Amino acid sequence: MASASDARSLVELRLLDGPNLYLPRPAAKVTLDLGELLGLDVAAARDLGVELGLGNTRPGAAGSVFRQRFAVRLVTQIVRRLASAGGATRLAVRTRTGQAVNVLVVAYPWRNAGRAEGLAYGLARVLDTVTAGPQAVAEMIIAEGAALATAPLGSAPELIRPQIPVVAITGTNGKTTTARMIGHVARQAGRLVGWSSTDGVYIDGQLVEAGDFSGPSGAGRVLRHPGVELAVTETARGGILRRGVGVAYNDVSVVTNISADHLGLGGIDTLDQLAEVKAVITKITKPGGWCVLNADDPRTLAMRLGTKARIWVFTRDPNSPGGRTVLSGGGRMTTLLGGWVCVLAPGADPLQVVEVIDVPMTLAGLSRVNVENALAVTSATLALGFSVEQVADGLRSFDPNENNPGRMNIWTLPVPSGTISVVIDLAHNEAGLEALLEIMGGIRPPHGRLLLGVGTAGDRGDEVFVRLGEIAAVGADVVEIVHKGDYLRGRSMAEISELITEGAAHAGMAIQRAHDSELAGLVSLVDQARDGDVVAIMTHQDREELDRWLLDHQATRDDAGVLRTKVLRAGATS
């Protein structure tokens, strides 16, 4: 074979080590530029199709979407001919068109890196010859196929086949909280638990490696650690797209929800495409395992149709249409009945697990999103075989401030006029901000105001920042912008401020202040706060610094009793 550098049509090659968007096993993802093929005149394209076995096809006009469809068939044929020449018969080939008409993604399974790469470069070089005519293309296929047959095999995929139970968790919001709660329930029940997330790798509750390990490397670190009895793996969209899922299968998969986040990145432009990525973990759940799905999220609920596992849904509404559908099909549902977390199954009485008000993470039932997280955790841990008593004990003892740093952490802070509440939360998108505002309102006494520091990482679309500004202005009394300097990701602070300010203006608010750091924003808002106010910061990079500042200023973390008192006081007077 010639060198890889002369393959003009090849845009990108990725060897995905695990199940992925394209196949439930390791796959090569090849991104191609079909510009030359799309630019052929109709007669030349038709002759090429005939030469490659497509018959008397109609290739469509140059550059048209009809030519694109013709190109997809032609490329698939070329891949199979090259693979056959290299010794691989009946190769599974998947294709996806890009937003631009000339972009095509081709995926096929791989076992040996050398052969997989050789096939990708060979395919690109064949496409580079299309302007030379059908005979030149046919000769190039023969030459590249012969070279592929003798290419070095290379390394195998780094795919783990777990020997212990694995829970895989994904979704737009709630992944880390759900993973932490599942791990806590299991640890309280005496299991040695390893879990990986966006915060790092934890073994038996201890951080052993900090960083974002929501991809396959995190799962690998957990499963290779000696003595671990249960692996809890947070599985993010980016890891699935870049390397695939790190394990061949799981025992329980959990999908919390699907909402707009990171759209426009990695070829994922719509919610339906995002849901397709998240669904990968459900497709590798063992047939005897359980898929735990949000019954009230239509994209999540639809994942039940693509898995061989049993279905267990969760919903706050016992009359949820999605829940009824699953129950009628023999599945299970975790829901709320009479203030209790209950499990429903066909032909059985409701199984009472725990009262919602006794689950600190739900903030006395105030936090709808964390009620849903608790329902998901109940489903997953019961599916793993833990007893009702073990699950209830774990839910009751999971303290949001101690066990879930950075997520709905609530403090009481003295100020000259009395005390205020401070909420630190890793809200990073519209749904997260709405949940944060719900919590703020739920602990505010009648005379209190809501003061909010809003901001998120720069890798969101313009519309996300505008929408954050709108939501903040509608929900809070005072709004200031808090930037995340380490997470601008190509944007300037001025650009982000302009977009958020634009959104706030839609709701009739003029934002006056923007801060270079989260801490500066917290200090500014606290300086304006008076007795009974609630201050909140959307944090991303300075959580530990915020915690230190609060402790230095005599703030105390709210325990379950204090939280309940705040909620009841706000509810009794609202």
Q: What is the predicted function of each stretch?
A:
Residues 247-258, 274-279, 311-317, 499-502, ...:
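A short, gly/pro- and small-residue-rich
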Residues 1-101, 105-113, 141, 382-387, ...:
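ATP-dependent carboxylate-amine ligase
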Residues 199-214, 218-219:
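P-loop NTPase switch/communication element
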Residues 213-307, 313, 318-322, 358:
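Flexible active-site lid/hinge loop adjacent to a nucleotide/diphosphate
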